[in-house]
Design a protein with these regions (language model features):
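The feature marks the mature, well-folded catalytic cores of soluble enzymes
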Residues: 1-201
Length: 201
């Protein structure tokens, strides 16, 4: 796609072709740039952010406050208040007073969405020209579920993500986590090369 509107139209057409009602999304900064969530909603598709921070701010109808930790500005009390307001089936006596309980609440809701999604939409940390693979890096594992569970997977990435070969991808992966969060490697690093081919094991 040459412009944002073209990218949105292509994604919308794919969703329409499979009669998609729900799209699970792993974190995609380019998705923010082209306002893909707004486009999908206007076209009758429910986009669900699956990164925990992105999910929280989506419920609050706020933009991300930070590129890596999008809900860093919120207290656990604000997150609990958001869940009470948006998770309408939440029992009134359910205690939401610590991060682990909040995580469990979000995980339960997101699992339902992962299992019912028609389309998964991901970004790509790298596009490997040598193999046609995408590299996905997360600390939550949500990208793997967005890629692997729905029957259709759409990758939204721009040209600067292309690297020549796997060796280059591995070199950049070592730098990526350190520069973003100070980790040696992120918890989940996945390479996806499309559906199984006849010469795969």
């Amino acid at each position: 796609a040459r412009v944002c509107s073209d990218a949105c139209s292509i994604i919308g057409d794919i969703c329409k072709s499979v009669d998609a009602k729900t799209v699970t999304k792993s974190k995609s900064m380019i998705g923010e740039e082209i306002a893909i969530n707004d486009y999908l909603e206007k076209n009758g598709v429910d986009p669900v952010e699956t990164d925990l921070g992105e999910y929280i701010i989506q419920l609050r109808d706020e933009p991300p406050s930070h590129i890596i930790v999008p809900a860093v500005h919120l207290s656990k009390e604000q997150v609990a208040e958001t869940f009470r307001e948006k998770h309408t089936d939440l029992p009134a006596d359910r205690v939401l007073d610590n991060p682990r309980i909040l995580l469990d609440e979000a995980r339960g809701k997101l699992r339902e969405k992962f299992l019912s999604a028609d389309v998964g939409l991901s970004g790509a940390n790298m596009l490997v020209a040598e193999t046609g693979s995408i590299a996905l890096v997360t600390n939550e594992g949500n990208a793997d579920l967005s890629v692997g569970l729905p029957r259709v997977h759409i990758v939204l990435a721009s040209i600067e993500k292309v690297v020549p070969c796997m060796e280059d991808a591995w070199t950049l992966l070592r730098v990526l986590a350190r520069s973003a969060t100070g980790q040696d490697l992120s918890v989940y690093t996945s390479f996806v090369t499309g559906p199984k081919r006849s010469d795969d094991l």
